[in-house]
Amino acid sequence: MAPHTCQGIGDAACVIIESIPATYGFPMPLPGYLAAIKAACEKVGTLFIADEVQTGLMRCGALWGVTRYGVEPDLMVIGKGITGGIYPISCCVVSKRHAGWLSEDGFGHMSTAGGAELGCIVGLKVLEICQRPEVASMVRYISNFIRAGLDEIRDHHADFFTGIRQHGVVMGLEFNHPEGAKPVMKHLYENGVWAIFSTLDPRVLQFKPGILMTQELSEELLRRVEVAVGAARREILGSAQRKTV
């Protein structure tokens, strides 16, 4: 959403926005961008809904990534990591100001997979763990450690691995080929690492290390990334060279 398009959002009940869009390869919001959209929403009475499935739960160094940009959303969508992969659950979190209908109409929030009591228990524990001070410290350490290693890998393959987008452990790795992230994904998978290319920008690999990784595991991850990027580079550049002969 371009800032000038906010002028017409008064006709909309809500604006749903992914704090850092995953399928675009995690382009980082410009300073003031999300805050400007929230201000425009408030001006005309439109709700701001933040999709925090990818960026929440300390991945950006705060419990919710959108708050790192000075924004308090009216509603928030979370899932996946909320139960650490142990029990499937997703959530729509509503601010008190806009939650009256939940008590007025008990059927208003029913769903096919609703009432996940076990999932709620697991989710509460995950939230408690994420808010421990040592977890915030770990996120800072892991993001800095892995970034330093990725910078070295990029230096080794500068004609192919060209950029790193990052906020905490949310990262987009840029490659100098229209679909450069696809062979990197393939070779990572062959080396036991799961990271997917960005559907709407296949040059970029979505790369999100876990927030509780040890130094040893981080080092092993970087070794495997080095192997995968090198193999993808040879595959891509070798193919390009053969076409020019």
Predicted region positions:
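Conserved N-terminal phosphate-binding loop of PLP-dependent enzymes in the Aspartate aminotransferase
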Residues: 1-245
